[in-house]
Amino acid sequence: MSGASYLYKAKPLKEGYTIIVGPENSELRFIEFGRLYLPEVGDEYADKTRDREVVLTIFNGLCDVEVEGYQKRGDESILYQNIGGREDVFSGRPTMVYLPRDVECRVKAKTPGVEVGVSKAPSENQWPPRLVKPEEVMERTVGAWNWRRRVYTSIGEWVKADMLLVGETINPPGNWSSSPPHKHDTKTDVEAPYEEVYFFTVKPPQGFGIQRI
């Protein structure tokens, strides 16, 4: 392990998209993660996925997501209306949208203060765009005792994607996550190398967490 920092603190929210971590500011080779913030009703943000697949995780608020450029739909756009709606990430299962490479996406706020997590990774295939509703999320409880937690997996093997696997984990106060200790940075018979990014939020806001690597 090098002396590089493995902790990247979230920056103050500003309107639009803010990169938190990615290849340009860390040792990551593939994954980029950031936050999209639309403070007012009617605010919009548009971007192109280019050579990457993207997953939008609606942290809170209600929004529309429009997708253009998916080859199998020609000039016809795909519109997911009034999706999300959570008060915060602790208020139920997430809503996520999978975006393939080479499309344009537009997010429009339907309520004030829409916040979206944005995960990106290189992709070779233009898989179908996909809305994953809360009722489609796989929920399971893992661990025991003080390392028990609830895991929501939205983008798993049932969603066609090249690289991204995306979900949320809810930890009771004082419990550990990612336990038992493990790693996945070496290719062996029992281990496969892949990158992993955690984005932490706490409730109440003055709470704190500790991560040991």
Where is each model-derived feature located?
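A short glycine-rich, His/Asp/Glu-containing loop-to-beta-strand
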Residues: 12-46, 53, 145-197
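Glycine- and acidic-residue-biased ligand/ion/polar-headgroup-sensing regions
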Residues: 50-80, 173-174, 185-213
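An exposed, glycine/acidic-rich loop-and-rim segment of catalytic or binding clefts
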Residues: 114-159
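Ligand-binding loop in jelly-roll beta-barrel domains
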Residues: 87-126
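Short acidic-glycine-tyrosine-enriched beta hairpin
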Residues: 45, 67-101
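Long, compositionally biased, intrinsically disordered regions
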Residues: 3-5
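Short, structured patches in soluble enzyme cores that scaffold and shape functional sites
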Residues: 101, 109-111, 118-122, 153-156, ...
